[in-house]
């Protein structure tokens, strides 16, 4: 049995723009509803949602039949959390709150087996097709994609050092936390924050490192894509449900 191909990673390396949807709802039913919607990727968030390994597993199973790539954000840059997500078959990880080169190297080590990393070895995980993928430990890294999230002024100051760590496939800019770091909480559209984001995208483009972002502002999303973001999340499932239901109720309010 062969290792599944990571189409997200292949497209990222080919320089293709990929549009995504952020998913905070923990249910597999919701995941399957959005899977065939037409997005290139969906992110299952476990940092700012009730989700964990046991809720992400059925989400992976729910989207598997569809032409969409799952990405998972662990709650932190924790090698144990990362190991558990890799073991259930996650192939693309977005690691949050990476502040410096050392933390970037720690994330890389977490996705690699010894002697090059610290990922624990098990031959009977879902990722190995329960022992049916020959030489999984030697070939797994080929299809694992590591994205690091930059979300503070401090991290922006070390962007080049973080992005050029060997083993990092892409860098994601987090507008919400970045706004707070700049002293503008709740204002990701503040001119100072926007300028910092656009500058970061430009710096990553110079490095040849794929850049990503989440913004439900369609105008700004298009702007980011034009500047060079490779993986751009343009909406959040919770917001779509909340704002859509409010708008429908408002249209019929008496």
UniProtKB/Swiss-Prot annotation:
One Pfam family per UniProt: HpcH_HpaI
Swiss-Prot/TrEMBL cofactor(s): a divalent metal cation
GO-annotated biological processes: phenylacetate catabolic process
Binding of a divalent metal cation, residues: 151, 177
Annotated site location: Transition state stabilizer: 73
Family the UniProt entry places it in: Belongs to the HpcH/HpaI aldolase family.
Function: Aldolase which can catalyze in vitro the aldolisation reaction between pyruvate (PA) and D-glyceraldehyde (D-GA) to form 2-dehydro-3-deoxy-L-galactonate.
This protein's name: Pyruvate aldolase
Organism expressing this protein natively: Rhizobium etli (strain ATCC 51251 / DSM 11541 / JCM 21823 / NBRC 15573 / CFN 42)
